[in-house]
Amino acid sequence: MTFKKYKPVNASQRHLILLNRSFLKKVPLIKSKIVGLLNSSGRNNQGKITVRHKGGGIKHKYRFINFKINIISIGIITSLEYDPNRTAFIASVYDILKKNYIYILALSNLKIGDIIQSGNNTLVKLGHTLYFKDIPVGSFISCISEKHSAIAKFSRSAGTYSTLIKKTRNYCQIKLSSGKYKIVSNSGFATIGIVSNENNFLKILAKAGRSRWLNKRPSVRGVAMNPIDHPHGGGEGKTSGGKSSVTPWGKPTKNKKTSTSNNKLN
């Protein structure tokens, strides 16, 4: 994928680097899978902030993506599109057996006209969705479901993938992009391949306004706050903190694990 670099005619374009999305379809193909989206901006049903640094953002609509496996399905890629709700691109697929259209996450190197399949007795091939019992060890997989009845929850961001490390009779172990190991059921499923838009992390927004378009608000340092707002706050003039780095709620942020992992597969 190529990049778009702009001439520095003003400060906001001096360091701007964006991805070239000219190959994507401009108009959504499946209008029935698109609905209006009400932005809650990191608030819960009481209006309280549960996720900080969220708010604003430009209006956009939600695309319904198929994150479930079809028992038997054969489809053809009809278009590649941009989705404002995620970093990866999406692909519209025409299901030959059910004679309808669905959206899926686009994979790297997946092209318009490619045939994809899902279900039992499916070949191990780019874009095909298989159960873990049919996937060979060492495969790069994405859109991972922990069990048959669940939707895909892991490796859905741009450029992410997991690796199938080990298989037993009922369970298998996968390594996520974060390096964490996860145990999932053999009845779960995954898609062969790496999620599209793998160069997304290289783009440079170059101005605060682009972050605000993406629903991102500024992140204020703890030492710049008052003592009531953060453990690092307060003091006359500028202070260096004078204590170990902690979260606004007092939990240590460095040199100490705050979670335990029992994902050991013997």
Residues covered by each model-derived region:
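Basic, glycine/proline-rich low-complexity segments that contact nucleic acids
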Residues: M1-R86, D95, S108-N266
